Amino acid sequence: MLMDYEKERTERAERIRKGGAEKYHQSNREKGKLFVRERLSLLFDDDIELEDAFFAECMSDGLPADGVVTAIGKIGGQTVCVMANDSTVKAGSWGAKTVEKIIRIQEIAEKLNCPLIYLVDSAGARITDQINVFPGRRGAGRIFYNQVKLSGRIPQICLLFGPSAAGGAYIPAFCDIVVMVDGNASMYLGSPRMAEMVIGEKVSLEEMGGARMHCSISGCGDILAETEEEAIQLVRAYLSYFPANFQEKAPIHEKRPPKHFETPLADVIPQNQNAPFDMHELIERVIDEDSFFEIKALFAPELLTGLARIHGQPVGIVANQPKVKGGVLFHDSADKAAKFITLCDAFHIPLLFLADIPGFMIGTKVEQAGIIRHGAKMISAMSEATVPKLSVIVRKAYGAGLYAMAGPAFEPDCCLALPTAQIAVMGPEAAVNAVYAKKIAELPEEERAAFISSKREEYKEDINIYRLASEMIIDAVIPANSLRDELAKRLKAYMTKEMTFTNRKHPVYPV
């Protein structure tokens, strides 16, 4: 008799583990999509360790696990919780038990104080079940409420494999990082069909909410992956930089030498302040080999943000990119920096600012886009950060650009300069024109060039980096080829830095 019960249990479990009908599996395979349990096998070190509510809706037809797997496993030896939509079950849509399962795995992650990963592939809420799914105290809104409450306490990561529609689009929005699979992933509040019906706009799914659009234009996506396998490996790598929660320190890895280059750093940085160069060239020479994990590479590329290691110590890098738009800060790049700085500060990852910046962009277009507000957001995030902050002036740091890149007034733990550095309100050319425009206009044409050249040299002397070192505005002038060792020593020294908190609830952020 007992064997009959065991047989029933086994048969039910096998049906549930298979997910939806074969035709939906076939459709996913044609799109290059993996089955939800295949995704989890790749994500975890050794497959699922624990799975709750496996039998949710097992008495209903066609709703195995109610379309979502909630599980506990390990990544890099670290315990993590996972919510994973099964798109073979009603397109991964949410029913009442789906929502309850997601809420419960969030509550478990909170109790275990461990990272929570969302594998999203869902058509949204089931309209036919909206009373049980949508408005209640433990309805879908509770998922987003929980995400906000967990933010900064545990890492929250989104792997977006398919759609994340309507209100469900806020799951990725509230995560620390969103990895999207090109060609399949999408997120939008209203579908193209709805947009055409309501506002008369005809638009493709990719234009409305595709992975490439969100990773390059809206900034809602952080990393664009070519395949699901690549996306999963990226998330495993990302987690290696982070502690399990905000109460722990970021993990120290074994020290590795930097990548070998024939050309030393001193020969890579142009002495001409206006000559473009790729800041990646500097970064790769000061970090441990192959440790740069760039975030939002396609969005606002005039600023680089990413995680790296120096002598095994995780560090968050915020660097101007002179190769793109001269490294000028725009509203999008300021927004990009603010989010990244906040992320690193939440999980005790020191910040390294590499400044080569002519300032913030000017003009009516950026003013109307709110560059002052977004710039304030970046400066606010940088000022609020209590982790070790190292500022390096690579070449120019002009105007408010100096402030945004953790200049001396913002209490970085050190402000270092390379011999190529300049700090000023503006560059020599602009300064001479601003101060002497009337005088230049009055001079005979044959005398203007010599006058401008003379005043430019005077200005350069005024902003000489050794003068700033003499005045103790900067802490040290470092040979470029010694920068890595200098940063490693300072990171080690600053790791005992005391965290200070002010007696207020929170600032009024310029968001």
Curated annotation (Swiss-Prot):
GO CC annotations on file: methylcrotonoyl-CoA carboxylase complex
Pfam families in UniProt: Carboxyl_trans
Signal peptide: none
Gene3D superfamilies linked: 2-enoyl-CoA Hydratase, Chain A, domain 1
Entry EC no(s): 6.4.1.-
Domain CoA carboxyltransferase C-terminal: 260-506
SUPFAM superfamilies associated with the record: ClpP/crotonase
Record InterPro entries: AcCoA_carboxyl_beta, ClpP/crotonase-like_dom_sf, COA_CT_C, COA_CT_N, MCCB/AccD1-like
Keywords from the UniProt entry: ATP-binding, Ligase, Nucleotide-binding
CoA carboxyltransferase N-terminal domain span: 2-254
GO terms classed as biological process: L-leucine catabolic process
Stretch list, region Carboxyltransferase: 2-506
Keyword Ligase part of the UniProt annotation: yes
An annotated Gene Ontology molecular function: ATP binding
Family statement: Belongs to the AccD/PCCB family.
Full protein name: Uncharacterized carboxylase YngE
Organism: Bacillus subtilis (strain 168)
Gene name in the database record: yngE
